[in-house]
């Protein structure tokens, strides 16, 4: 969309942070208003992450106004909230392309802009990276400042606390800004906090604080009295004791929507030495009433009409695989009170809303804590319960040692319901579910299942739930099911595939939900088609039978070729000295960028036309 200068006259003056810093203070509230309206106008036309960015408009303006970015280094955690940052750093006219194929990256991305210091997408990484960047800046000796912005959800993760503990030990010069959009601030308390925060962050207070420490360091009673007095003053504002104990100078909470107040506080804190912590209060969805009332629904949005405030409703077509999982979960829980379901802050995305309402005492949202989620499940299994960990493929990576050490080694019956497996689309490199088959397949005692449709998905969930000899995993994609009939639940024979079509010369071994496209290829080439179902254990007898009766084999999966299901087939053939040509079709050896699932599958040759072309070229 073209930029309307008349509609956004102040924002039109800002196409870089250098231009932003030329604006007088009194024009900044108007800039924030225009930036918020432009964000609404852009995202409603193009889709994208929405509510988080509305809540960080004033913070973004204040940070770029006070700090000399990009020389000073600003790090955003996760990046959902960074759309205003992109708009102010030379990408205003491209914001309508965000999350689209060939467009702006959905998160801060180092290859896109010098303002994007850290490529992000997963949570809770900013402080760790920020410490490293701050240490490097100190050694560089150019007085380069480091700022990390982290949300109240991301800061609950263990990695964030590990980083803060380290920062308190080595004491780098850096600022951590906690963007807290969970609490509401009353006008009076907010005003008091803002005033005290400015006092506590000011140079006079800082000088008195450090000078007093030096003067009275040899007089323990007075030193202790001063420390307690300072704690009491800060206690009038908020209980920031935890961050103080970790070694940070804590300031806040302050109103995150008062841009001029933020600028004053940030200027005061900019030159303070050691690790600093600024706690700001914001409202997710700020300035757009529907998003303020329902920030979860408006977290990421499709195209919508901002005047109505209504998001387009589902067409009522086929259910998503997440819905299939959620329905199975409720159905099974109603029959078995030993079922326990765990999610690391992905209730809506994993299809668990209904379960959380029907079975609240058996539903555990552990927040952004994937490592804890898996070991918590291990403990439930030891206690005689039947835990199910519902988790995205890309986030299970964060708990790999826990899967190995706490679940698999002990042969605990934990079921992993792995959503968003394969290509996920608009969130790009950081969110593709490209690696789960590779990183799980090498774990002893693990059963791995790849359904080809929603009925198989249900049967495999049922099979994994009743498998008591160790952990099991069922992986399924983002998107809708294919519309097959749902049959009564029954346990599948472990490690057994089925032949779907008999052909000649060529056999295609399919793993997972690319089956509809693979079936078209098999029909076109008159190839035998096998639904392998299990990646581990593989149906070795069936593989050897197919190798003996066909001239060539093709494996198909929506996972990295390296170490994936096809690699497992290769290993079986080599172990049995079967010199049969094999073509492995799957995800290539690079990080898959954003685009719709259909666009990326076509580009990577994972639609029917692409697979057929690959096979014909290989056979030629």
From Swiss-Prot:
- Kindly name one Pfam family recorded for this protein: Transketolase_C
Pathway(s) annotated for this protein in UniProt:
Metabolic intermediate biosynthesis; 1-deoxy-D-xylulose 5-phosphate biosynthesis; 1-deoxy-D-xylulose 5-phosphate from D-glyceraldehyde 3-phosphate and pyruvate: step 1/1
Q: Which GO terms describe its biological process?
A: 1-deoxy-D-xylulose 5-phosphate biosynthetic process; isopentenyl diphosphate biosynthetic process, methylerythritol 4-phosphate pathway; terpenoid biosynthetic process; thiamine biosynthetic process
User: What is annotated about its quaternary structure and interactions?
Assistant: Homodimer.
Role according to the record: Catalyzes the acyloin condensation reaction between C atoms 2 and 3 of pyruvate and glyceraldehyde 3-phosphate to yield 1-deoxy-D-xylulose-5-phosphate (DXP).
- Sorted alphabetically, which NCBIfam families does this protein's record hold? dxs (TIGR00204), PRK05444.2-2 (NF003933)
In Swiss-Prot or TrEMBL terms, this protein is called 1-deoxy-D-xylulose-5-phosphate synthase
